[in-house]
Amino acid sequence: MTSLPIVPKGVKTAHDVKLCADLGFPAVYISNHGGRVVDMAPTAVEVLLDVRRLYPEVFDQIEIYADGGVRRASHIITLLALGVRAVGLGRSPMYANVYGEEGVSKLLSIIKKELTTELALIGEANSNNVRGNASFVNTRRVELEFFGAPLS
């Protein structure tokens, strides 16, 4: 056995996030694996909106990480504002890796610059002030885009 924490990855429903919290996991990793494994799997944004609506207390019980479809800093800010602790990148660094270490470094530099710009545009100095503050996300617009109607 290991003393390292075990974090379930690939969690795709609000119910499963809640279940992981109830079972005592220290964190969960919401991921639809970039939508490439299961067609029509819910995005991290969809799952987070459901968690916020159905089980808002979960954000105080465990850490939540997410990835899937993250291409720009605005995606990172959206996920942070919806309550995640960390955002993973997958496809973008893989594509950048075609150019080796220099390509990945360039990608991360671009994302860092975008993040600084996005934060300045919303009047924040760092991403810690955004985390868990859904007022930075037009959730009604996101709900309309993903679900076709407001959830509340």
Write out the residue ranges for each language-model feature.
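C-terminal extensions of enzymes
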Residues: 93-152
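Alpha/beta enzyme core
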Residues: 1-66, 71-95, 142-152
